[in-house]
């Protein structure tokens, strides 16, 4: 229908009032005219009209977010006008409806003293009583026992030998400064010590002996000769015999000069 209307309208392109029979179209039927064609873009081709379809309206989408609300105007109120503004500096502060959240109360001195005073107290009534300082209790018990023979220093235990143990160890050291493995086992079993304790005692005893011998050698060495002090005027004092004693004949030659013979001549 629309094609027939175009063919009938474009008479310069298709001359003749009748349409060609080859199209096989029925009798012309008239429909209400469509939108007016756009004017030709090129004046040389006036016979060809450029028909553009009507643009479809853009789809309407629902807004994903609601329109912003001016809540700040209700909370803070309208701002001052230009005429009512004062030249005073602006003061920044919290809004009228601002309420600070109170901080949780910290542990007071009473709670801290209670926690320090009872380190082994359980966290809950149903929890078993277990102290976190078990290693300290063991060290205190080991150090406080008088019969254990051990004292605790800063970082290690120090063995305190009895008089009988020291006497037997000194006897063994008198015979041999380096103890054998077999003798070390026997001494440890007889004195109630471990083999490591016996070995350490011999190491310390050898170090002590070396220190004593070195001190004796330093005391027995003769002192180096000391230099004579200089006199007050700064001239060094001669350390050898006087020069006159080295040449005794020079003093006699200078003191008593030898007589010179005089030859007398007489005139006739």
UniProtKB/Swiss-Prot annotation:
Question: Does the keyword field hold Glycosyltransferase?
Answer: no
Q: What is its main location?
A: nucleus
Where in this protein does the record put region Interaction with 5-mCpG DNA? Answer: 196-207
Q: Gene3D superfamilies, per this entry? A: Homeodomain-like
- Gene Ontology MF annotations: DNA-binding transcription activator activity, RNA polymerase II-specific; DNA-binding transcription factor activity; methyl-CpG binding; RNA polymerase II cis-regulatory region sequence-specific DNA binding; transcription cis-regulatory region binding
What the entry lists under SMART domains is as follows: HOX
Q: Where is this region: Disordered?
A: 1-152, 209-268
Q: Which cysteines are joined by disulfide bonds?
A: none
InterPro entries assigned: Caudal_activation_dom, Caudal_homeobox, HD, HD_metazoa, Homeobox_CS, Homeodomain-like_sf, HTH_motif
Top-rank taxon: Eukaryota
List, in alphabetical order, the GO biological process terms annotated in this UniProt record: anterior/posterior pattern specification; bone morphogenesis; pattern specification process; positive regulation of transcription by RNA polymerase II; regulation of somitogenesis
The record's GO CC annotations read: nucleus
Tissue specificity, in the record's words, reads: Intestinal epithelium.
Q: Where is the composition biased (Low complexity)?
A: 73-91, 115-128, 229-246
Keywords (alphabetical) are: Activator, Developmental protein, DNA-binding, Homeobox, Nucleus, Transcription, Transcription regulation
- Residue range(s) of DNA binding per entry: 154-213
Subcellular location per UniProt equals: Nucleus
**Ranges annotated as biased composition (Pro residues):** 29-42, 54-67, 92-108
According to the record, the segments passing through the membrane are none
Q: Does the keyword DNA-binding apply?
A: yes
Name the segments for region: Interaction with DNA. 157-178
Per the record, the similarity remark reads: Belongs to the Caudal homeobox family.
Function, as annotated: Plays a role in transcriptional regulation. Involved in activated KRAS-mediated transcriptional activation of PRKD1 in colorectal cancer (CRC) cells. Binds to the PRKD1 promoter in colorectal cancer (CRC) cells. Could play a role in the terminal differentiation of the intestine. Binds preferentially to methylated DNA.
Name of this protein:
Homeobox protein CDX-1
């Amino acid at each position: 229908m629309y094609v027939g209307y175009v063919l009938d309208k474009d008479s310069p392109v298709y001359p003749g009032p009748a349409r060609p029979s080859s199209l096989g179209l029925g009798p012309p039927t008239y429909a209400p005219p469509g939108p007016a064609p756009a004017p030709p873009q090129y004046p040389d081709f006036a016979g060809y009209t450029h028909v553009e379809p009507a643009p479809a309206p853009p789809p309407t989408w629902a807004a994903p977010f609601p329109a912003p609300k001016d809540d700040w105007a209700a909370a803070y109120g309208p701002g001052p006008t230009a005429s009512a503004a004062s030249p005073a500096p602006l003061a920044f502060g919290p809004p009228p409806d601002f309420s600070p959240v109170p901080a949780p109360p910290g542990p007071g001195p009473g709670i801290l003293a209670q926690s320090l005073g009872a380190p082994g107290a359980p966290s809950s009534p149903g929890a078993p009583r277990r102290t976190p300082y078990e290693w300290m209790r063991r060290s205190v018990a080991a150090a406080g026992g008088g019969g254990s023979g051990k004292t605790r220093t800063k970082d290690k235990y120090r063995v305190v030998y009895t008089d009988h143990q020291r006497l037997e160890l000194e006897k063994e050291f008198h015979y041999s400064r380096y103890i054998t493995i077999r003798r070390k086992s026997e001494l440890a079993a007889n004195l109630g010590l471990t083999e490591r304790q016996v070995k350490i005692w011999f190491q310390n005893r050898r170090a002590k002996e070396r220190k004593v011998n070195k001190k004796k050698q330093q005391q027995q060495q003769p002192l180096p000769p000391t230099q004579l002090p200089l006199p007050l005027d700064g001239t060094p004092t001669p350390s050898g015999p006087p020069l006159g004693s080295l040449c005794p004949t020079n003093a006699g030659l200078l003191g008593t000069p030898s007589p010179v013979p005089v030859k007398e001549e007489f005139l006739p």
